[in-house]
Amino acid sequence: MSKVIGIDLGTTNSVVAVMEGGEPTVITNTEGSRLTPSVVGFSKTGERLVGQLAKRQAVSNPENTISSIKRHMGESYTVDIQGKKYTPQEISAMILQKLKEDAESYLGEKVTQAVITVPAYFNDGQRQATKDAGKIAGLDVLRIVNEPTAAALAYGLDKGGDGKILVFDLGGGTFDVSILELGDGVFEVKATNGNTHLGGDDFDNKVMEWMISEFKKETGIDLSQDKMAEQRLKEAAEKAKIELSTVLSTNINLPFITADATGPKHLDLTLTRAKFNELTEDLVQATMEPTKKAIADSGFTIDEIDKIILVGGSSRIPAVQEAIKSILGKEPSKGVNPDECVAIGAAIQAGVLVGDVKDVLLLDVTPLSLGIETLGGVFTKIIDRNTTIPTSRSQVFSTAVDNQPSVDVHVLQGRREMAADNKTLGRFELTGIPAAPRGVPRIEVTFNID
């Protein structure tokens, strides 16, 4: 039986892993790295580049390079490259194809099945888009697993022991926090919260804005209008952010960043960790509210949380770690690799599905409530958020006026009170309702989530 791979399809980087001899193994790509940048580029001749090769040519070819496409999954968004339009699913499929090929060259056999992870807070449309990307890449996606849950699987299988775990996952573009209870091989998610548009990219952008502002003060030149300079600034901002996790000050030096009538201009700035913290303080604070909400929804007290697992590259930021510590009063566990544990968890779940991993049961939850629009534009919830899945719930509705021949069923997902403030999943019309006074016909609506 061919292997099922586990894929962490990330905003910034992606990772692929597989179960070998009962142990999860992270697969090294053809460039010799365990991380593959989630970047796609097209050369001037139209050749497609994915991963490190695409990232390397981004500065000289910014208009034909796409990064952070994950932030647009589930949206009606297209990228125009060399006169051709691509959907987020198609770009993501190119990244998945590269991971699939790397896995095949490592394993020496064809790979056709995968488990792919997504942010816990992804809605149904974003999850479906991820499945579609897998299909385009030639992969049968056996299961979509929430990233924090996958990280907890990796931690639990490696470290063992029972307890209540908080997984804090701050990646390149998304943020999730999940509370799980581990016991006797059962991984039960109690609550989840997050923000699908908060991550390392936003920290980079704050640094970039500061660099552009400082350079403008010094030279009067606005670099935000220069595509090529902007790509160099983005790379320098990311590098500075990473360095400031281990040092208190870093130098940002970009020679020949631009030129004017007086000649070439160089950017040379010093960014301290204190200044970085000041620039990004609102982003750090934005992770705290969902964390508090997830703890409250889990039914546990802060003192009952036994372990904190940090996932995602941005969780290495010292100010982020300090903020978590200030809420929970304990040091986060350093026992997992924040870049690799999600893919490892996906590989473990793949192992569970094909029977390679025994005595592990994963009980996840739905992150957003599922329901329909009722009279007055109200969102009536049928399945509440944080309900353990798989699940099935039914509710009986009726007509609003006498002799109503049909009902428009508007299916939504979200957490707001009014239908207009939530995400539409679909609409359908139920016709052929027998003539009767309002309130008499009984219409049963059933939702299944698997």
Swiss-Prot record:
It holds the Pfam family HSP70. The keyword Nucleotide-binding applies. The modification Phosphothreonine is found at residue 174. It comes from the Bacteria. The keyword Chaperone applies. InterPro entries: ATPase_NBD, Heat_shock_70_CS, HSP70_peptide-bd_sf, Hsp_70_fam. PROSITE patterns: HSP70_1, HSP70_2, HSP70_3. GO terms for molecular function: ATP binding; ATP-dependent protein folding chaperone. Keywords: ATP-binding, Chaperone, Nucleotide-binding, Phosphoprotein, Stress response. Induction: By stress conditions e.g. heat shock. Belongs to the heat shock protein 70 family. NCBIfam families: PRK00290.1. Acts as a chaperone. This is Chaperone protein DnaK. It comes from Megasphaera elsdenii. The lineage of its organism: Bacteria, Bacillati, Bacillota, Negativicutes, Veillonellales.
